[in-house]
Amino acid sequence: MELKRVVVTGLGAVTPLGNTPEETWENMVKGVSGAAPITLFDATNFKTQFACEVKNWNPNEWIDRKDARKMDRYAQLAMASAVQGVKDSGLDLDQVDKNRVGVIYGVGIGGIKTFEEEASYYALNKEKGPRFSPFFIPKMIADIAAGQISIHFGFHGPNFTTTSACASSTNALADAFNLLRLGKADVIVAGGAEAAICECGVGGFNAMKALSTRNDDPTHASRPFSASRDGFVMGEGAGCLILEELEHAKARGARIYAEMVGEGESADAYHLTASHPEGLGAKLVMEAALADAQMQPEDIDYINVHGTSTHVGDISEAKAIKEVFGEHAYKLNISSTKSMTGHLLGAAGAVEALACVKAVSEDIVPPTINHDEEDKDPEIDYALNYTFNQAQKRAVRAALSNTFGFGGHNACVIFKKYAE
């Protein structure tokens, strides 16, 4: 059967750079850091005392007050991004066949703050007998964001959550893409959300020695591909892409941001938390996405890298890019928007895919900020264009986004300019 074409017709985002996709993109292009001292809890005694938090967050701008109280922060962020995306798409909710509209969101951890609060309450009061909120489980579970969005809009199409650590929302986009091109839905609200900036989240990653401890200079802490990088900066947020079958989008006169043309998945099969030192999984996933899109390496102008600002991860991804793209690796642009947003964990792929869509539609590549010192490891290879410290205008025919998760999960998606 002939596969259908899939386009992006709406965007939504709540990130450390802004509470809308427009504000997020504007600050991304400007090279603004979202890092600051933690305000969501008292981090005085933690090794890491800063993060990339969503600022000025008021869920009631997007969600009914009564409903918001029944949601963990991650689900609130997810809902806000979906509301924005659906509005931006111009979907007529009275006319669209809601049986053919789905919701797929990627979530890496889910309601960790809800779990933390309930466990703490139980520990302090267990002598009185077990007492838990009836909303404990529905607020905590990772699938509830997709469910809440579906309920809010009355969408009856495919509805589920993908969980593959930091690759979660890229897998959500990939699953949505495949369902649409197979004709199993007309529209899918696809994205991801995460809100793990809490004692358990920061403490857990600190215990793994995964986080930067640059407490005296948070805004310069996330520095992918720079010699002095010392770990990732935790972020939170949500991103949404409205993916739509092309003929359905054309029939309703929808604005089209870009076309989604390929996706890939692979596994490192190497280590629970470390990427393969030779970039094997990264190489395989990019090759898979290019093959799926029926594109050559030379067709890609921009790679939004996983680029978390860890020593091994940045090196292995650079190796993989050079192996897959050959000489063309030196002609395209590479950047890590995590240098600005921090690592949004399960939401990273959705927000970074949004950055790729905007790069394709506006012909500008956001920067990798905070670079001030070259790494001595030759594999980083500074002949590559990492788009250091300042956005670059260029023709972006197609953009590729990488996300890699604990457990060796790798996912990749490709977007290109839409043409008839």
Where are these regions (language model features)?
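Condensing-enzyme catalytic core mediating Claisen C-C bond formation in acyl metabolism
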Residues: 5-9, 36, 216-293, 302, ...
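Flexible, low-complexity linker/loop segments at domain and module junctions
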Residues: 1-8, 95-98, 293-299, 330, ...
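A glycine- and small-aliphatic-rich helix-loop capping segment at beta-alpha/alpha-beta transitions
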Residues: 22-27, 112-129, 179-182, 202-215, ...
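Short glycine/threonine-rich loop-to-helix capping motif typified by GTGT followed
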Residues: 270-279, 308-325, 330, 344-351, ...
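Glycine-/small-residue-rich "gating" segment that lines the acyl/pantetheine channel
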Residues: 123-133, 174, 178, 194-251, ...
